[in-house]
Each structure stands twice: as C-alpha cells, then as structure tokens.
Amino acid sequence: MSALVIALPSKGRLKEQTEAWLQDSGLRLEIDGGARGYSANLKGLPGVEVRLLSASDIATALDAGDVHLGVTGEDVIRERGGDVDARVMLLRALGFGRADLVVAAPQSWIDVDSMADVEDVAHLYLARTGQRLRVATKYGVQTRAFFSRQGVVDYRIVDSAGATEGAPAAGVAELIVDITTTGATLAANNLKIVPDGVILRSEAQLAASLTAAWPDETLIAARRLMRIVEGRGRAKGLSSLRWPAEFDGPARRATKSFLDHGAVRRSDGLLVPAHDMFDAAEALADAGVGPVSVDRPDYVFEASSPVIEALAARLGQGKASETASASA
C-alpha cells in the first residue's frame, strides 16, 4: 500500500498549533525517536506517514510533489511563484497562524497613504538620486507581483537575510515588505503599514500537492483524514436539539423556518447552527414541546467530502474518488 505522506511543522508556534488542531480532531501525533525526531505517525489513522519539516520546506515539498499533504502558511506557499495554484491546492484554512504580508514605510513619510503615493515617491527618488527605491523583503515573488498590479515600477528588491523591519533604520532600504500579526514590531521600528498595501492575509492551510503521485489508496487515506477534520470542524458550529417522540409533529412545524438557515432534520430532533439554538429552543417551548435537550456534537459526518472530490477532479482521478467513496 502507498502511504499518504503528510508534512507538518517541526518547530515553533505553528507546530504547537498544528498538534493542538490534530488532537482536537481526535488525532494524536506520535513522533518517532522522541521529541527531536523528524518522522511521526498519526494515532488512529493507518496508512499515513508524517514528515516534520520547516514551514518553508513544507511549501517546497508540496510544490515538488515530495509529499501529498502539508500544513504551512499560505504566505510561504504563494512565495513559490509562477502558477502555484496549478501545483498546490488549498484544501482547508485552519484558523491559526494568521499574519498579514504588508508594505511598510517610515512613519516620517507623512504624505504616503497609498501605493499610488509610494509610486510617486519612487519616481521622485529616482529623479533626484538616479537610483531606484530599495525594498527589503524575504518575499520577493509576491512583492514583485503586487507592485506590478499597483503600477509601482521604480524600485528594486533587497533580499533580507535578518530582521527585515530594521532595514530602513540600518540604511539598507527605504521600504519593507514583511509579515506582521499586530503591527507592533513595525511601529517599534518607526514604520507604518501602507493602508492599501496589504498583499496577503495569510493563515495556516492544509494543502495538497497536485504534482505528487496519487494512487487510489493514497486518495482513500486522504479522504478518511478529511472526513475526520471536516466532521470535527462542522460539529463546532452546530447544536443538537432533541425532544420526546410524541411531540414530533408540533416540533417539526415549530422549527420548519430554521431549515432555511442551515438546520438539518434528524429522526429524533434537529441540528441547528449554534447561534440559532436559543431561538429554536424558544420556538419549541412556545409550541408546547418539552422537555428539549441540547447537546454539542463531537463530529458531524456527511456522506461525501466535497474537498476530496474537488481534489480528485483536479488530479483527473474521478474514478479514484468513486473508489474512495466505496471503500472508506
């Protein structure tokens, strides 16, 4: 059997958040060789090989087809350049590892409030000094693409090997493009975010390689994983209401309107979006239905996984998707 190879972060906050997400989904990461190992398996999910890599190495491995799935920031995936969407498919945003890729200018540039202003400054700088405005960044691919879309041409990239936010103060650049979460570090270095200079609002993504080899059994394992994480994610937004069987008629009439807002009938009750739970309970009480119990489900599984079906279609493996549906 061909194993499903998943790359996960090997260190830092992203590693901790990824492990917490897996554990919340009922999957425990077991690292081979102790805490310093670089391979692992997922307890409860056979047929899966886990590789622990840096965030940037995960993006590289996905792009090259060395792994099937990976968890890393969208910012490092996008930095692979070219038509990356033809090589890597984003399956699920994970809700952590959030950061913005932004253009930041010195706070002393009080008249710079837009990328159009940046272009004006760059043009004047070139006319005055004969040199292009220097932009320090580790994200050259996305910077060039964004500046092109914004019509900024009179600049040059300075590759940043260290703390990018210190480049203007050090005299090695006039502007920077960097990742920020709160903007506090930029402010501490007397920099401001250009209001329309947000290049990407990034977060951790579960992504799939479109260049890897995907035999049917590998797609089946991926479908099993997605069923688990989707089932857990779906359950977090739902509440389950149950009532005595003898009240089923009036209960169904009382909750009919909720079906138009994401509620789903069950043989013994109703699944409703969590934010509608109190309204649904009140509607049942007004109809004389009771007692009504409310639970939060651990998982809510659907008959199919649209994400894996979309992946199979991108891979040209519609038949593999059918095989997975029959076998999982």
Where are these regions (language model features)?
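Periplasmic solute-binding protein
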Residues: 103
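Short alpha-helical basic/polar micro-motif
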Residues: 59-60, 168
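Short, hydrophobic/aliphatic alpha-helical segments
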Residues: 123-124
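Alpha-helix C-terminal capping/helix-to-coil transition sites in glycosyltransferase folds
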Residues: 64-66, 172
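Small-molecule-sensing regulatory modules
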Residues: 2-47, 52, 71-100, 109-119, ...
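N-terminal low-complexity or amphipathic/hydrophobic leaders
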Residues: 51-56, 63
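Conserved, well-structured functional cores that handle cations and Mg-NTP chemistry
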Residues: 58, 68-72
